[in-house]
Amino acid sequence: MDPTLKELLHANLEWIFVGGKGGVGKTTTSCALATLFATTPISDAASPGGTRPRRVLLISTDPAHNLSDAFNQRFGPHPTPVKGLEESLAAMEVDPKNFTHGALMSSLTGAKSDGSASSLSAEAEADAAQHTASFARIGAVLKEAARTMPGIDEISVFAEILHYVRTLFYDLLIFDTAPTGHTLRLLALPQTLSSTFDKLMSLEGLAPMIEAASHLIGTNLGALGGACGDTAGSCEQATAAPSLSSAAPGEGSAAAASSQSRWCITADEVRSTALHWRQTMEEVQARFNDPNRTSFVCVCIAEFLSVYETERLVQELMKYNIGCDSIVVNQLVLKPSSEPPCRMCSARQKIQAKYLEQIDLLYEDFHVVKMPLLSDEVRGVPALKKFARFLQEPYSPDTHGYIDVQEPC
């Protein structure tokens, strides 16, 4: 097999995941790969010259983000153009806090009046404030639990995947993933969530129970705007309604209806939402399993633990039916033959040669890219471009010599 990633470059993929053991150069590889794709135009008959820049979005799913360090540029939870490649490459770092601080969780920390609460009596306002404070405390507990919940990193990343699953703006999404364990949980989420939804929705009476619970919440929070009333034909009178008798007829009713409508959920809405999520997850799963749309690039170094974990990762990817036929072996000690021997280099080369032989035997039907150990850090677009060159062209120490990725001072 060709020892480069040129096949990926011309495969018209939509998603590429880059993963492996921690500390093997996943971020450098994913950033270089994103730079390579962003600088390779794609065919477009509607564009001048028949080509246009490929629009690439690089997403870091690792809780310990490094994209900002690799590009010497600060990124956040939203796509930000990469300096020097503004037309073709954007990057973002998924933050689980954004997921736990979303609209749903924020609403639980206390609903605010829209101004109509001024028509309430002092007693009603006090009662409404008491109900709101109670739910605010519950919401605070739920938010804290969500922030510390095991798996929240994977769920927040999956939420971003769902967000971009139907977008047509980007031609390619590249995921700089977390170490192997996190990544495997992320890739298993579509199957896990689909199975969970099926089991939950098969429970008789679950949707009516959710509907009843939402009505209870709506009844209490409805006190902010007045009596809850029968806005949806099923909500009962709020317990705080007797204290509103002093208000003029109809005052606060519009606010009450608006307040409760935010919280009352019907059984049909529950089923419809569950079905929508189920269909979206099936679409994500279909993309994961389509080798023409999704590919996984494994990154490792020529050492026992890394090679062992790479084999485990490849086996798990096969289990989930996710295409993977590319492996990047980083940090190889490769010296020109004219260089005098070095005791330390020779020792490292001996160890690496042992594991490179195993890699060649295990993955003879893979594209195995062998990348050299560099004397400088790979930081910034110019350095990443130099590094990316050898993802599509085999590196030879005798031909290319040492690679200086940083500009001389």
Curated annotation (Swiss-Prot):
Q: Which SUPFAM superfamilies match?
A: P-loop containing nucleoside triphosphate hydrolases (SSF52540)
- Give the UniProt record's GO annotations in the biological process aspect: tail-anchored membrane protein insertion into ER membrane
Q: What is its main location?
A: cytoplasm
Which keywords does this chain's UniProt record carry?
A: ATP-binding, Cytoplasm, Endoplasmic reticulum, Hydrolase, Metal-binding, Nucleotide-binding, Transport, Zinc
Spell out the molecular function terms from Gene Ontology. ATP binding; ATP hydrolysis activity; metal ion binding
Q: Which residues bind Zn(2+)?
A: C342, C345
Q: What class of enzyme is it?
A: hydrolase
User: What's the subunit arrangement here?
Assistant: Homodimer.
Concerning its family, UniProt says:
Belongs to the arsA ATPase family.
> Any idea what this protein is called?
ATPase ASNA1 homolog
